[in-house]
């Protein structure tokens, strides 16, 4: 499965940061909307640990987030799990 999480929709009317999450199933060639993030996030970091996806920081307009959300792929549910010491935007994360 491939997940697209948050981001920015650029339109002639303006830029809108989004809380949307979509999942692509390559076997079915099908996109499906999933549970929304708790807040819109653009330029967020994403990491995968076990069966969970973490959305880390990012921004919404002029606001930079400190929150970290965990997505349970089996339950299709986001939970806020912690706060960063300071806001992070445009970062990349890796699990070793």
Where are these regions (language model features)?
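Kelch-like beta-propeller repeat domains
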Residues: 1-96
